[in-house]
């Protein structure tokens, strides 16, 4: 089964998405937390063997430098370039935000004019579909990447050899549906809690995406950074 995850337009687009969740001025966000979320996203893409553009890795290396300097004990006065790196990054995110807002406004105006002359093109793209509570598949994917970052140590020390085909999406879909029959609702954290292997967690996640795609399961996240809740959809 081929499940695509909506690509961001670039690393700044991903960073803007993460920063916007805090709903504060870009210069007030907890930059280390944002960096950790970005790195967790990149690591999850790599673990899932999804294609990753080089610009994302370049940004990751720059973010790791900023994070390491932030976390190192301040034994000496802060070097000027340390502050410059962080401020330069935040400035780029702010500038990108302005350009993106402008491009969206221009696109909106273009669409309005197009309505005067022809019927708009109808598209239904699963990767960009809005789910319950205005959440998207990307919100689910970002939540998954955070959970995987938290479980990395457990996966690292589990040396049991698991064949690639030992976990099947179809089987995991049945497992999720069976649990929802019993429990009515299930958090993403609970769903992945007992996974001992990375492949198992990834297969469970892909199974949940397929159930959402088929509208058999809905998701809800009532607040930014809150728990992702899966519920059986009433047919």
Swiss-Prot record:
It is found in: Cytoplasm. Coiled coil: none annotated. Keywords: Cell cycle, Cell division, Chromosome partition, Cytoplasm. GO terms for biological process: cell division; chromosome segregation; DNA replication. One of its GO terms (cellular component) is cytoplasm. The keyword Cell cycle applies. Component of a cohesin-like complex composed of ScpA, ScpB and the Smc homodimer, in which ScpA and ScpB bind to the head domain of Smc. The presence of the three proteins is required for the association of the complex with DNA. NCBIfam families: PRK00104.1-2. PANTHER family: SEGREGATION AND CONDENSATION PROTEIN A. Participates in chromosomal partition during cell division. May act via the formation of a condensin-like complex containing Smc and ScpB that pull DNA away from mid-cell into both cell halves. This is Segregation and condensation protein A. It comes from Streptococcus equi subsp. zooepidemicus (strain MGCS10565).
